[in-house]
Amino acid sequence: MEDSDFDDAELDELYEKAINRRVNETLIRRSLPVQRDLQNGVVPGQDTYYEEIRTEVTFGPTHHQLNEELLHSYIYPTNFEVRDYQFDIVRKGLLQNILCAIPTGMGKTFIASTVMLNFFRWTKTAKIIFTAPTRPLVAQQIKACLGITGIPHDQTAILLDKTRKNREEIWANKRVFFTTPQVVENDLKRGVLNPKDIVCLVIDEAHRATGSYAYANLVKFINRFNSSYRLLALTATPATDIEGVQEVVNNLNISKIEIRTEESMDIVKYMKKKIKDRVNIQTTVEIENIVEQLGIAILPVLNQAVELGIYESCPPSAINAFKAMQKSQAIIMNPSIPEGIKWRNYFILQLLNHVGQMLKRIKIYGIRTFFSYFQNKVKEFTTKYDLGKSTNKIAAGFYYHPMIQAITKECEEKIKDPNFLGHGKLEHLRDELTQFFYENPFESRVIIFTELRESALEIVKCIDSMENSEIRPHIFIGQAKGKEGFDEVKFVRKHGPKGRKKSDREKRLEEERRMDEEKKQAALQEKLERTSRRTGSSEEAQLSGMNQKQQKEVIKKFKSGLYNVLVCTSIGEEGLDIGEVDLIICYDTTSSPIKNIQRMGRTGRKRDGRIVLMFSSNEASKFDQSMNDYYNLQKLISQHLVQYRKSDRILPPENQEPECEKKFIEVSEEDQELNNMEDTDDVIRFATQCMLGKIPKTKKGRDKGKAKKGKTFFMPDNVITGIITANNLVRKRKSAQNGSGAALLDSIVNDDIDLEDEDGQVEILDVDQEVNRRLASNAVQKTNDMALQIRNEETPEIGDTRNKAKASSSMKVKKEPTMAVDHSDDEEDLPLSRHVERASRETAKEVPNATNVAEKPFPPLEFGVQRPSKRQRLQPEVQPEVQPEVQPEVQPEVQPEVQPEVTVKPEVKIKTEEGSKLYKNIFFSDEGFLQPHEKELFLSKYNPEDATVTIEPVPRFVRAHGRVKHSKRTEQLITLFEDMNHNRVARTIEMNKLRGIARRLHTVSQSQGQSNSQSQAHSTSQKSQQASQKDRSSQDKDLTNSELEDLLDSDF
């Protein structure tokens, strides 16, 4: 269960504002007769009085907004026949919390729809909720509510999916809801639904509201905040005893129980005729022989249990599995019994429980169902006992008894005959079906109820073996997968001797693989054989269970006539709209009156029906006892032995009794279309589309503009909420007047400075002092600052920024007429552009008091220092080719197809004094890099001793810089740093490989140096030999360098 999102303070606030229920307790003391002595004195130690507490519950005005003009009357739809019991229950259900217990098929959904309709009229904004435990029941109520009462479909919502998508918006905008109790409970605890908004709650299958089921938890949560709401509980049987009825009344705050039976005076005239036939089936000779043999085998164990006082004395054939299980649980829970005695008694009772199950199966269901259970238990115990995994000698005396072996042999011989019927019920079942389909038309339907899946499949096979094409059976069970029997081979392989040698282990593994493959092949072959049989789908369902889709498909085929006999377990007893059924056959019976009544309520709804009850062994007495308990329960309820809870009237007290307004409800075309639907999923799908305004639930139809309503968090006043980025926490500087000039210059170089202030005015950037300081530290001569030629260009799309930046090295840049710096005025208007071009020597003017530069500037496409590559440093004798200076070609005409129209921003101005500029045109060979003395310090202090390949320190590179194109070396460095920042594995592997090669070269170089120094100490006669040896070593080194070239040609 989820925790509630409300804190204690919010809970108290909701409680105080929402609860209009007041409880007044009065303490009354009453005197008791006392014993007196001879002097008429009261004998001490006696209670002279007792205290009686009287509780009076009152309710204040409701907090719901009511439509005052509609409170004087309530509407009762006349679209169907007006029945007295329905009319009476609706009238009482509008003013009290009612538990409506009437037989199945008598219109409980109509009663609920009428109550929901009137509370929809009486209130303005309150919520009406219908809850049911299953989807089919919800679909039935949707049809009844929208297709009968005419409640607007745009005010209704269906909440069945587990997703919480748009749940808050649906609860806020709709008024009538059809859902399951789990959904409502979870949304209440999450704070999505306000419990004060609920004015009417309908609970279907209310007999489930016991213990910790969702119904009980849901009502308990609502009662904490809201007592002014109407609750209507629907069921066919409230409980099996008076204690269960009282628990349901307490959990649901019931004020009145309206119970009807098929014999009630106001309901009997609306009931269709039901003929009940009781058939007592005698056990066969084969069954009696097996029961007698089981009794002989279990008699020693039963006598020992009787002597120990843990089981009652009885004939072996009367052992009851349920009693044995209860006594075994009581022994386990008793801490006073010593452990040895406790477990001995437990295993004895467990064995009696297993024998009781065997006797029940063979007496009620037949030899086939009995033998599947019996064989599984015998195989499980004997396998474990033979391997030493069980030491229960008491159970061994039973399972290794000669009678058990005789039973196994006899049952195997009987089951081999395909025409063998394991019980007399199967023969009588055949006769009933043959006679029924002979006397009735083929449109008739039959349902057969049984508790066990094995029995259901046996019945299907028995009917199919009749080879009557007019009788088409199919199984109908739940979703759970069938229980697999004991796997003897798997258990032996797991717990048997495995061997200690490697050959034994490999042999065992090979055998396991072979056996698994054989098992898969056998399962596949068996599945193929099942599909070829008429009962193949039923056999597959019995093994793997039936999901909701398969269940819906079977019901659809049953209604259409493809199947006319449905063999159901308990899943077909409650809530499902299976259709009109003319014959019900109860293959077995239960001690629960709820199940028996639910079974018999499947027929006789719209036409007469017939019920066949098959009894064997003690089933007849068990059925009579359960029905007697049900009738006695009705008497106890009618005698007011149940303590009810007072409920709020909700309506103002001046409206003593609203008048009934019988009215024919006009149903819209959409609601009429809903009435014609039979499939549950179609009903739910149609109702969901109506809830959304007939808009299909597609991605395009969703409203993405509305922001999702988030949770409310309580925080101090004026606190900053939301996510704050690190960039917003940094105070940005817009001028160099109040801060360091170095930071401002870095911003200029990195092109991340804003030229305009908050008012849109252009700031004058004065960076003379910082530029002079940096230029003075250089070892090279200073140069004149040149004005920049700048063009304005539209900002590209965000998605194309990276692609354009990558292609900047190959783009053709349009040349504009250059502009010289005019020093007659301090300001000059310059056009802006992403692409920056250097001024040529012919068009640039010198800045006064500036020295000329002795070093040529770099070409426009080379932003960086011309240093020898790694290959050149390894081969110093090879001189790199000098690249001629590329002079920009001045285009006399502007090509509009190459470059867009240029616009000039005259408002952008810059201060151009000595040593200051925004974008530089001349770059020095070492500008932005370490100086010689700094490099020497770096190599001596921070460079590894064994490093032969080093990377020069470089400034911060901006890959998306569009004004100056990077050189090839710079592009490689940028790519390297990006790979290192993203921790790319390929780059790390490549760098490690290069590092290993470099270290190898360094080691070879040192060894060669040592050999050369030793050779210099030799005589001069060996100098020629030393020179030749040196040449050979250099050739070897050149060979290694040639191998390294392929690696160095790559991008690091």
From Swiss-Prot:
- Localization terms from the record: Nucleus
Q: Does the keyword DNA damage apply?
A: yes
Question: Mind telling me which Gene3D superfamilies this protein's record contains?
Answer: P-loop containing nucleotide triphosphate hydrolases (3.40.50.300)
Q: Which InterPro entries match?
A: FANCM/Mph1-like_ID, FANCM_DEXDc, Helicase/UvrB_N, Helicase_ATP-bd, Helicase_C-like, P-loop_NTPase
Supply the gene name: MPH1
Q: Where is the composition biased (Basic and acidic residues)?
A: 503-532, 1029-1040
Report quaternary structure and partners: Interacts with the MHF histone-fold complex to form the FANCM-MHF complex.
Q: Which family does it belong to?
A: Belongs to the DEAD box helicase family. DEAH subfamily. FANCM sub-subfamily.
What stretches pass through the bilayer?
none
- What organism, scientifically named, is this protein from? Candida glabrata (strain ATCC 2001 / BCRC 20586 / JCM 3761 / NBRC 0622 / NRRL Y-65 / CBS 138)
GO-annotated cellular components:
nucleus
Entry protein name: ATP-dependent DNA helicase MPH1
**From what superkingdom does this record's organism come?**
Eukaryota
Main localization (coarse):
nucleus
- Domain Helicase C-terminal per the UniProt entry, residue ranges: 432-649
